[in-house]
């Protein structure tokens, strides 16, 4: 299971319940966002072309459960050394079970729903977030898994090792891309005085800030989870591991809703446990809101997570302009109708899961209708 963990800076603000490494609006220039949308589009197109023939088959339950798993697992924040936290993405296990193209589609759907309905990741940065996590994550996980697993039997321990290493490589590839995207902003996009317009920290700060946690604790956590889930599936449902065998693909022989009941049950348990993710909640590195740049305590946390280099005295102009470009209906997984953060978190997980299922059912209906 590739679980991509992303670093967060912890601060004592209980209202901030965001998943990390989802680049918000205002941190990337419009031209950077446009380039990453353009770079993601061919992969989305190929993914849809490969999957549209199967969306009216039993592939839909598999796509739904692994996209929903990705959504829910990203709500679990884990503490890391140095006052940061990380969380998983689930793109590795999606790749191993679904194959890379179906994984790209599944994880992209989860990320789009997070951005639109929960404000987790910017609308302008959907292309960037999908490119980093869904596209590169899936392709790296697939390449590493296939290279190491080879033609080993489904029940072989070699596949457990392959999954663990695939997760470690994919998490770091995705984190490194995000670090580069953050780090080039002050180099390429600044005003006449040299003041950054978007993400304020250059490469020599952004890369270590993003990578140290991924190369150590988060990467090791991904190895354990990835290998553990594959080991479980080898015993409980080995058929789910056949998609990434040579020549295999997700198709009409995929398991249906009833056959996937154990996975949905496990997902329900995770959903109920999501409030545990609040315990380590905080603002991710590179996800500070404009007000943080003027708040002494927040500025201290930003500097501590950024090589002890103080942030600008005020939020970059581009960030101030774009940060409020979109207001999500359930921002930060905190529905306005609920005062309880715990219940709000659970409700958000339920709503997100439901929206993912509806998205795939709607896609199946649309593509099926086009064939009649």
Tell where the protein language model's regions lie, with residue ranges.
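Membrane-interface capping segments at transmembrane-helix boundaries
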Residues: 48-52, 235-240, 362-372
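Membrane-water interface at loop-to-transmembrane-helix junctions
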Residues: 161, 165, 209-213, 247-268
